[in-house]
Amino acid sequence: RLFKSDTNCNIHIAYGTIVNELKEVSRSYKEARMALDVGKIFFEGQDVIAYSQLGIGRLIYQLPIPLCKMFIKEIFGGKSPDDFDEEILTTINKFFENSLNVSETSRQLYIHRNTLVYRLDKLQKSTGLDLRVFEDAITFKIALMVVKYMKYMETLDY
């Protein structure tokens, strides 16, 4: 890690937008605070996070948990993404990393293209979402992020 002291403590840095007037410092501080929180959820490997980097994580972080639960239930039925085996989750994440490119994903996973297609078809049968279709891929990606957010929020509820 970039910032690690002798006491084994991790240091995380977050910052908001640059401001020109003193009255805007409060807003930038709130943005930095949010960047720190959202960074813990969606940017685990990063020690420095900017508010401008948060993307859709910033929106998900502000969703009420009951709405998240309803969304996940609609997308996955009674299932949870945790029910998927590690192989399919690795496949999905790699597929997203490669911008839904079947050939490049299969190459990076060291599997035949047809094996990847089979896995995607299998996922489509269980979820109704075809990750090769952009809209379905977005829905699935957001659902995975929402699940990650809900898990994080559960750890805060002692």
Residue spans for each PLM region:
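Cytosolic nucleotide-utilizing catalytic cores of signal-transduction proteins
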Residues: 1-158
